[in-house]
Design a protein with these regions (language model features):
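His/Asp/Glu-rich metal-coordinating catalytic cores
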Residues: 2-71, 76-289, 308-322, 341-344
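Conserved beta-strand scaffold positions in the cores of enzyme catalytic domains, especially
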Residues: 11-13, 119-121, 192-194, 329, ...
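A glycine- and charged-residue-rich anion-binding loop/surface
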Residues: 17, 41-45, 49, 66-67, ...
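Short glycine-rich phosphate-binding loop at a beta-alpha junction
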Residues: 93, 386, 549
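Conserved hydrophobic residues forming the short capping helix/wall of the S-adenosyl-L-methionine
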Residues: 108, 402, 538
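Broad gene-expression machinery/nucleic-acid interaction feature
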Residues: 132, 147-149, 294, 466-468, ...
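Hard-cation-handling environments
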Residues: 202-332, 336-503, 507-519, 527
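C-terminal tails and terminal domains of large nucleic-acid-associated
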Residues: 519-555
Length: 555
């Protein structure tokens, strides 16, 4: 691709920085934009009732004529989960590897978007041309198969985006990471490297996925007489393959529970990414037909999600599986930051039921540690370092690695979502401006209709409850005709607080009298006076601040 010394490449992260999840980055050159990944994140503890969080793509909507397509690095939720929501407004083609497209197809089917969305399967080593860009897919290793790094060729220079990766010389399925190709591109001259920062604080190398297979073999050998239940990420197909291998080796049938687990395993097996021996896989309803020591159950719930299968088993509300004393339960994952309490709660519930819970040594990370990050930098030799994928401390740790490897401080950019980094070979790179970004909250079928005000109301209700005041006023004079009747929910138990309720009614009546004395007849003002008077009274009596909702009827 011919270089243009005057034009500038604009790199615009719209999510995924200073947080875990919601990865999405736009690359813009003149009249062309490509979007790398389009992921979701899961709600914080204080986002009551929220199911998912997706990125605000206002910038893409404002420049929709420039957007040429979504280029996806791999099939994890934090990289593909927002696609069904964003595609409704920005319907452009999707380019990804075979398994990634298969997992995206599952999502598009759920949202009735399969027929209207163009998908193209790209092989590792292949390139695609989108507007001013050429994008090459490079084989990497991760905790899901078919993961890719991207070499993005633009008139301003080459940018390498690693996606999520690790260096695994002995992967369970397929080839090792294509380090040779990284080196070859590095010799051409790389303008910038955008590298996975998740494990940038961890020294050494990430262990191979195959080591987990040996751990499973040891656990299966030591627990020959018990039922084994294993919780892991649904998308970790290599992990599932090793569980199946150990189950087959020790003569156990395998059942799968959890909607996402069933979907991913079905897709991976159909596309040839899972090798399941004949008659090994059974339906969850069939496990009762086999002795406990002949069954392995692979389930969702490794992160303590309240509605996941393992959590429902722990709470005795699963319809098909009841935890038994001496069950062996393996957590084949590490808690994502923020999920530690939920995971601990599930482990405690399972332990109370007599299960033997194993949550150590049955997991390896899918992300590169410091020595692997250094290796990629050494092969690529970028002019600029742009750490991505992680909280601020992770990005900062990678920035230090880049400094240690000789990249000047002024050539290292720790970006925030919305920053517009402009760069080319000739002029110093700089953050030029900031575009609108943010989080769009998904609650049931509602996308974006729950904002900060609604969340604040939900938090208020959760903390102090609500008090509803119902009264009837004479239309013209605003004289009290009936009530006030007070209904309380989540504040106090009315039957045990009758004196408080009686006093509250008197406070409301006094507030109405004040309005009459001052000739206040505007109902909005009357409601505010009731709220202020009653709120002050309740705070003095209880040191609580319930939401107060006056309802006025006229007669």
């Amino acid at each position: 691709m011919k270089k243009n010394n005057n034009g500038k490449l604009r790199i615009i992260p719209l999510g995924g920085l200073e947080q875990i999840g919601m990865n999405i980055t736009a690359f813009e050159y003149e009249d062309s934009i490509i979007v790398v990944d389009c992921g979701l994140s899961f709600p914080e503890d204080d986002m009551l009732g929220i199911d998912l969080v997706i990125p605000d793509v206002t910038y893409l909507k404002e420049n929709i004529d420039k957007v040429k397509g979504f280029v996806i690095t791999h099939g994890h939720e934090d990289h593909i989960g927002a696609l069904p929501y964003v595609l409704r407004e920005i319907n452009v083609p999707i380019y990804a590897t075979k398994l990634t497209v298969g997992l995206i197809d599952n999502k598009l089917k759920e949202h009735n978007l399969l027929r209207t969305t163009k998908r193209k399967v790209i092989k590792h080593g292949q390139s695609i041309n989108l507007g001013c860009f050429r994008i090459e897919f490079i084989k990497t290793n991760h905790s899901i198969q078919d993961a890719s790094a991207l070499a993005i060729y633009s008139p301003a220079g080459i940018v390498i985006h690693t996606g999520d990766f690790k260096v695994d010389y002995t992967p369970v399925f397929g080839d090792a990471i294509d380090l040779q190709r990284f080196a070859e591109i590095g010799k051409k001259g790389v303008l910038a490297l955008m590298c996975d920062s998740t494990n940038a604080e961890r020294k050494g190398f990430t262990m191979s996925e195959r080591t987990v297979g040996k751990t499973f073999d040891n656990i299966f050998a030591e627990h020959k007489n018990t039922r084994i239940i294993i919780a892991t990420f649904a998308s970790n197909v290599d992990r599932v393959q090793q569980i199946i291998n150990s189950a087959y080796k020790y003569g156990r049938k395998v059942a799968v529970e959890g909607r996402s687990m069933v979907n991913v395993i079905g897709t991976a097996a159909e596309l040839g990414y899972l090798q399941i021996p004949d008659k090994t896989l059974i339906d969850i309803d069939q496990i009762k037909n086999y002795p406990d020591d002949k069954v392995v159950l692979i389930t969702t719930g490794s992160q303590g999600e309240s509605m996941a299968a393992l959590s429902r088993m722990a709470a005795n509300i699963h319809k098909k599986v009841t935890i038994k004393p001496n069950d062996t339960i393996i957590f084949s994952s590490n808690p994502i930051p923020g999920n530690e309490k939920a995971v601990s709660r599930v482990i405690n519930e399972l332990s109370r039921k007599g299960a033997d819970v194993i949550f150590q040594d049955a997991h390896v990370s899918g992300h590169a540690c410091q020595e692997e990050i250094k290796l990629i930098y050494s092969l690529v030799k970028p002019k600029y370092s742009i750490p991505v994928h992680g909280e601020y401390r992770h990005l900062k740790a990678q920035a230090q690695i880049a400094r240690d490897l000789g990249i000047p401080k002024e050539n290292i950019f720790i970006l925030s979502s919305g920053d517009v980094l402009e760069l080319n070979e000739e002029e110093p790179a700089k953050v030029k401006e900031k575009v609108r970004t943010g989080a769009i909250l998904v609650d049931g079928l509602g996308v974006g209709d729950v904002g900060n005000i609604v969340l604040r109301d939900r938090q208020h209700l959760a903390e102090d409850g609500i008090m509803i005041v119902v009264l009837t006023l004479e239309k013209h004079s605003s004289r009290l005709l009936a009530g006030p009747d007070i209904v309380s929910r989540g504040f106090v138990y009315v039957r045990e607080s009758e004196d408080l309720m009686d006093e509250a009614r008197i406070v409301v009546e006094d507030a109405i009298d004040v309005c009459l004395d001052k000739h206040i007849t505007d109902w909005g003002k009357i409601k505010n006076i009731i709220k202020d008077s009653l709120g002050d009274f309740l705070w003095k009596r209880t040191k609580r601040n319930p939401m107060i909702l006056p309802i006025i009827m006229e007669a």
